[in-house]
Amino acid sequence: MVPPKPALWALLLALLGTAPSRAYSPACSVPDVLRHYRAIIFEDLQAAVKWGGAGAEKTRPGSRHFHFIQKNLTRPGSSGRRGRPRASCGAQKEHSILLSISSLGRTLRGAVAGGRRGALERAAWTVAVRTEAVMRRHCRTLRQRSRRPKMRPARRRGGRRQLLLRALDAVATCWEKLFALRAPASRDS
């Protein structure tokens, strides 16, 4: 006769082995994430960039914000940057890019937290909150406890504005990379 404890452990291990596991299911539904991006976040990014400059000169060709508005991220491979250096999104795989987007969303929210909120700050806050909501909804493994952004000492408005614009450009670059990676897969199927 087999002692009850080892038999119980063997039975538990056998049951755990046959139980459906979430480990084999995909971590993120990239098509759903991209669909929400096209529907909502792309417009929010465009609005944020619209408020990035001061006055009407912000969207003229040749201005430093014009290349941002000219982007069409809903078509893979189209950049519109015209030789400008890209913001960093060093990730090369879908999961890493999604982690970068999630992290940049938290960075945006942290940069906007506290202080005055102009049109750029409100638009960046909207991008950050909606990006985090999309990631929470469609990416199980990216669900991390959102730490409250640390309050930084007040900086000049221009410094925060530059940080916001760089972060927005990095978010846009990451989305562009995700579209570019997904484009060959959608053409093959």
UniProtKB/Swiss-Prot annotation:
Top-level division of the source organism's lineage: Eukaryota
Keyword set, alphabetical order: Glycoprotein, Signal
Signal peptide interval: 1-23
Glycosylation sites: 72
Keyword set includes Glycoprotein: yes
Protein name in the entry: Uncharacterized protein C20orf204
Source organism: Homo sapiens
Gene from which this protein is expressed: C20orf204
